[in-house]
Amino acid sequence: MAADPIHQFQITKLFTLGHVGGQEIAFTNSSAYMFGTVALIAILMLVPGRQLVPGRLQSIAELSYEFVANMIRSTAGKEGLKFFPLVFSLFMFIAVSNLIGIVPYTFTVSSHLIVTVALALLVFFTVLIYGFSKNGLKFFKLFVPSGVPIYILPLVVFIEVISFFLKPVSHSVRLFANMLAGHIALKVFASFVAMLGALGVVGWFGAVLPLGLTIALTALELLVAFLQAYVFAILTCIYLNDAIHPGH
C-alpha cells in the first residue's frame, strides 16, 4: 500500500514544556524544524565572518543581503530599508524552511496554514501600526484612490477596505497552498516508483516515467522554494510601501 501523502504534514509532540491555564504547551516536530531553520540561517550569516576574499558561504550571505536590499529599494524606496531586518528574516526563514522540506523524511514548516497566517499577520499589523504612527489619519488616504469620480467613490473605498483586510488571507494561503500541493504531488509520484519497483523487472520499466516525473518535480520544487519566499517578501515590501506612502 502506498504511503499516505498527507502523513508528511502531521504535527507530532516531542515533549511537554508545561501547562498554562490547563492547556498543555508541547514542543513539536514543527517547533524543532523552526529552531533548526533559524540555526541554519545563523550559521550561514555568522560563521563565514567578514573576509576580504569571501568564501562560498560568505558569498551566499552577501548575495542574499543585496538581493533583499535591492528588492526593498525598488518597491518601497530608501525609506523602506528601515524594514530590512523584517523582510530579510521573512525571506530567509521561508526559503530555508522550504528547502529543508524538500529533503526526504523532513518536515515542511510552511505547509501549515497556522505558520503562514502568523507570518502574514506579522506583516499586516506592522503595516497598520507603522502606517498610523507615521501618517496618523492620513493613512486612510490609502483607501481613497486619486482621480476616482465622486459618484463611484463610496464603492471604490468599500472595495479598497475589503481588499486591504483580505491581504493577510491571500498572503498566507498562497504560500501554504503552493507548498502543500507541491509536496503532495511529489509524494504521490515517488510512491508510484516504489510500488512499481516492488513488482520486479516488469515494474522497473513502468517505474521509469514516474521516476522521471519525480526528478522533474523535485527540480520544480527547488525553484518554487525560492520563488515562494521571493513572492512573500516582495508582497511584504509592497504592503510596507502602502504604510510609508499611503497616497495613491
From Swiss-Prot:
Q: What is its main location?
A: membrane
Q: Signal sequence span per UniProt? A: none
Localization per record: Cell inner membrane
The UniProt keyword set, sorted, is:
ATP synthesis, Cell inner membrane, Cell membrane, CF(0), Hydrogen ion transport, Ion transport, Membrane, Transmembrane, Transmembrane helix, Transport
Locate the transmembrane regions by residue number. 27-47, 83-103, 113-133, 142-162, 192-212, 215-235
Q: Which InterPro entries match?
A: ATP_synth_F0_asu, ATP_synth_F0_asu_AS, ATP_synth_F0_asu_bact/mt, F0_ATP_A_sf
Q: Tell me which GO cellular component terms the UniProt record holds.
A: plasma membrane; proton-transporting ATP synthase complex
**Would I find Ion transport among this entry's keywords?**
yes
Bilayer topology reads: Multi-pass membrane protein
Q: Which CDD domains match?
A: ATP-synt_Fo_a_6
Q: Name one GO molecular function term.
A: proton-transporting ATP synthase activity, rotational mechanism
Q: What does this protein do?
A: Key component of the proton channel; it plays a direct role in the translocation of protons across the membrane.
Q: How does it associate, per the subunit comment?
A: F-type ATPases have 2 components, CF(1) - the catalytic core - and CF(0) - the membrane proton channel. CF(1) has five subunits: alpha(3), beta(3), gamma(1), delta(1), epsilon(1). CF(0) has four main subunits: a, b, b' and c.
Q: Which family does it belong to?
A: Belongs to the ATPase A chain family.
Name the record gives this protein = ATP synthase subunit a
> Which gene holds the coding sequence for this protein?
atpB
